[in-house]
């Protein structure tokens, strides 16, 4: 993907610059980040979602906080800007989970590992991994609210307790602007 684009772009005159949408994975080493930067990558966007080890495990993110931080270090050392998507309001998220996630995010900003971030509210959808896992008996604490059979093309599914996290929306986004 990005590596092939960067290599191909190196042959262009003039080279294009581009922004990539990625997953923070351990494959993003300093050498790869340097190559991507030389090949025109100026910034990346990626979802951290929950900046805690237990949170990443719960949502089956497929990566660990250590890999996310290592990838961010590699990108920043290569001069690449980083934007992260954060998510709050998971069905099983406690206020302490949210505080821990915000603290990790604060530390990442303090260390210069992130340039920007935005908090999004979790939305359960019919085709999401979480919903499919719930159908298989996983996530017994998730309680989807049955939809009306007449709802056409409605992908979002409400769940019990989702409104309890709404009170965090404004404070989380305000904290990013400090």
Stretch-by-stretch model annotation:
Residues 1-81:
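Conserved SAM/AdoMet-binding glycine-rich loop
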Residues 12, 39, 70-82, 108-114, ...:
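A structural motif corresponding to the C-terminal end of an alpha-helix
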Residues 17-20, 83, 112-119:
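Acidic/polar loop patches that form or flank catalytic/metal-binding clefts of enzymes
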Residues 31-34, 91-108:
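Catalytic cores of alpha/beta
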Residues 46, 84, 105, 117:
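Conserved, mostly hydrophobic/aromatic
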Residues 54-59, 88-96, 112-170:
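Flexible glycine/acidic-rich beta-alpha junction loops that bind and position SAM and/or redox cofactors
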Residues 62-69, 95-102, 170:
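Non-membrane alpha-helical structural segments and their capping/turn regions in soluble enzymes
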Residues 71, 75-76, 82-87, 96-104:
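C-terminal structural cap/anchor segments
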């Amino acid at each position: 993907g990005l590596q092939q684009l960067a290599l191909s772009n190196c042959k262009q005159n003039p080279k294009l610059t581009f922004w990539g949408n990625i997953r923070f994975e351990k494959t993003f080493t300093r050498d790869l980040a340097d190559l991507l930067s030389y090949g025109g990558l100026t910034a990346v966007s990626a979802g951290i979602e929950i900046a805690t080890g237990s949170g990443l495990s719960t949502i089956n993110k497929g990566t660990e906080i250590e890999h996310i931080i290592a990838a961010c270090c590699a990108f920043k050392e290569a001069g690449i800007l980083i934007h992260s998507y954060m998510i709050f309001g998971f069905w099983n998220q406690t206020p302490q989970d949210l505080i821990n996630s915000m603290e990790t995010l604060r530390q990442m900003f303090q260390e210069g590992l992130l340039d920007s971030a935005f908090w999004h509210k979790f939305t359960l959808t019919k085709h999401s991994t979480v919903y499919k896992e719930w159908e298989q008996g996983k996530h017994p604490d998730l309680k989807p609210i049955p939809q009306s059979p007449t709802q056409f093309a409605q992908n979002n599914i409400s769940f019990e307790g989702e409104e309890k996290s709404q009170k965090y929306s404004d404070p989380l986004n305000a904290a990013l602007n400090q």
